[in-house]
């Protein structure tokens, strides 16, 4: 066993000296196991740099409290590896692949894969484009998701990114029976706990593996936990040929953890204090998320936008990798429209007649045109009032408000807050509903009948109740 000693500790970054010139390779895992007066010290480091002088600089995967200079460190000879396969379903893990739920250890004979690996080769990639139906009207109509694509959920604090992710996990498991992997990267422990219990109650947990590196953990764990989740998802794709969903909440925290470690590793900061390797790190993660000839990983990533500034290097770098974006807008939450997805800012490269079909494409574009015209008229309405509009514009406003409310919907995962049952709406019903609104079939129904409903049939029922 190759052994070294700790020579310097700078918070989560630790230098280790190996005698005899036998240095561990970059990304190798080093371990410390010893007892001290505070109890057991059980640490894992990952080698990040070779400094010369027989010394390596490493990043700790858990807190370095109680670690002292001179402590003996062992080189495991391989990268951090985590359990994969069916044994991971229904379980909760940390960055190292240790089970952190109360269901005992993972059996020793379960296969473990290293978290660092190459992206699939060019010839293995699949080229066919298929739509993933989510059952959420605003998403399916205006910014549809692609199987094997990468989707960004953008929004500031408290506009509903995590709730939307929970609803997607629920819908995909219930309607498609698909496997999901959830990576909680640097988010609140309470939210992870709530998600776990909600998924246990609804039975979705049996189809899900969960990995957490939360806000209270050192940056090493937060930076690597996304790779842990991805490794588990890759096994289901490559070995079992599954279509897997990988949820990352929140991809910004992955970048944030990298920037915390970067300065301590001695790298020069770049724009806004981020790490100079920002684009490389993001690329290494994102390029592994793809469709191959065997199966696909569709990734849905919540992206926190610092101070709602989309030009910040972290969200801007993430944008480059995405196939679709779902933008959440605070203004819509204030109007009571949930999910608060901005129908004009959200985009998808799948929204083209070749992929979604001519009718869907036409309806989606007409919906966007109507909403855009309404947005342009809002200034006139604010200054002069509705009466000053032409008859044609009055009709646009009339229909746009109904469309805006019909884009809202009740979620299964929000039943305990709203007291109303959630709804899953197939794409063809969504397209039909909006087409009929645009044609003016429901111009006589009250606006409020369109709020927080599923299909157009629910609108008609609501209207009957209101008029009764």
UniProtKB/Swiss-Prot annotation:
Subcellular location: Cell membrane
GO cellular component, one term: plasma membrane
CDD domains: ATP-synt_F1_beta_C, ATP-synt_F1_beta_N, F1-ATPase_beta_CD
SUPFAM superfamilies to which the protein is assigned, alphabetical: C-terminal domain of alpha and beta subunits of F1 ATP synthase, N-terminal domain of alpha and beta subunits of F1 ATP synthase, P-loop containing nucleoside triphosphate hydrolases
Positions of ATP binding: 155-162
EC numbers for this chain: 7.1.2.2
Presence of keyword Ligase: no
The entry's keywords: ATP synthesis, ATP-binding, Cell membrane, CF(1), Hydrogen ion transport, Ion transport, Membrane, Nucleotide-binding, Translocase, Transport
Reactions catalysed: ATP + H2O + 4 H(+)(in) = ADP + phosphate + 5 H(+)(out)
Pfam annotation, one family: ATP-synt_ab
MF GO annotations: ATP binding; ATP hydrolysis activity; proton-transporting ATP synthase activity, rotational mechanism
Purpose of the protein: Produces ATP from ADP in the presence of a proton gradient across the membrane. The catalytic sites are hosted primarily by the beta subunits.
Stated family: Belongs to the ATPase alpha/beta chains family.
Quaternary state and interactors: F-type ATPases have 2 components, CF(1) - the catalytic core - and CF(0) - the membrane proton channel. CF(1) has five subunits: alpha(3), beta(3), gamma(1), delta(1), epsilon(1). CF(0) has three main subunits: a(1), b(2) and c(9-12). The alpha and beta chains form an alternating ring which encloses part of the gamma chain. CF(1) is attached to CF(0) by a central stalk formed by the gamma and epsilon chains, while a peripheral stalk is formed by the delta and b chains.
Protein name: ATP synthase subunit beta
Organism: Bacillus cereus (strain AH187)
């Amino acid at each position: 066993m190759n052994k070294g000693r700790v020579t310097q500790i700078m918070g989560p970054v630790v230098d280790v000296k190996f005698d005899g010139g036998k240095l561990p390779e970059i990304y190798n895992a080093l371990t410390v196991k010893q007892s001290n007066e505070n109890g057991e010290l059980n640490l894992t480091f990952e080698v990040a740099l070779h400094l010369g002088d027989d010394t390596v600089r490493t990043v700790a995967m858990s807190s370095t409290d109680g670690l002292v200079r001179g402590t003996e460190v062992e080189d495991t000879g391989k990268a951090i590896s985590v359990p994969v396969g069916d044994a991971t379903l229904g379980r909760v893990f940390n960055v190292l692949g240790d089970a952190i739920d109360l269901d005992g250890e993972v059996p020793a004979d379960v296969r473990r894969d290293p978290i660092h690996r190459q992206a699939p080769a060019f010839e293995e990639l699949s080229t066919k484009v298929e739509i993933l139906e989510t059952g959420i009207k605003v998403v399916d109509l205006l910014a549809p998701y692609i199987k094997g694509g990468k989707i960004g959920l953008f929004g500031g604090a408290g506009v509903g990114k995590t709730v939307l992710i929970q609803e997607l996990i629920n819908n995909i498991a219930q309607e498609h029976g698909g496997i999901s992997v959830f990576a909680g990267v640097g988010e609140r422990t309470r939210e992870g706990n709530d998600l776990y219990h909600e998924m246990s109650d609804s039975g979705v947990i049996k189809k899900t593996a969960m990995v957490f590196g939360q806000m209270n953990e050192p940056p090493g764990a937060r930076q690597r936990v996304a790779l842990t989740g991805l490794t588990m998802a890759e096994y289901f794709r490559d070995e079992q040929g599954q279509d897997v969903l990988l949820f990352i909440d929140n991809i910004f925290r992955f970048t944030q953890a990298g920037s915390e470690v970067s300065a301590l590793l001695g790298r020069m900061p770049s724009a806004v204090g981020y790490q100079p390797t920002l684009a490389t790190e993001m690329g290494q993660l994102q390029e592994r998320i793809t469709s191959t000839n065997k199966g696909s990983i569709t990734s849905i990533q919540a992206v926190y936008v610092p101070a709602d500034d989309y030009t910040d290097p972290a969200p801007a770098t993430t944008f480059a990798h995405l196939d679709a974006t779902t933008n959440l807008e605070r203004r819509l939450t204030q109007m009571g429209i949930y999910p608060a997805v901005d129908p004009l800012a959200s985009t998808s490269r799948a929204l083209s007649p070749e992929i979604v079909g001519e009718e869907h494409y036409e309806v989606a574009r007409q919906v966007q045109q109507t909403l855009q015209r309404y947005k342009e008229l809002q200034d006139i309405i604010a200054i002069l009032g509705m009466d000053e509009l032409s008859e044609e514009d009055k009709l646009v406003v009339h229909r746009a408000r109904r469309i805006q409310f019909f884009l809202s919907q009740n979620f299964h995962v929000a039943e305990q807050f709203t007291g109303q049952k959630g709804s899953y709406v197939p794409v063809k019903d969504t397209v039909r509903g909006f087409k009929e609104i645009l044609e003016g079939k429901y111009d006589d129904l009250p606006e409020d009948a369109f709020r927080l409903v599923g299909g157009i049939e629910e609108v008609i029922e609501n209207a009957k109740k209101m008029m009764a």
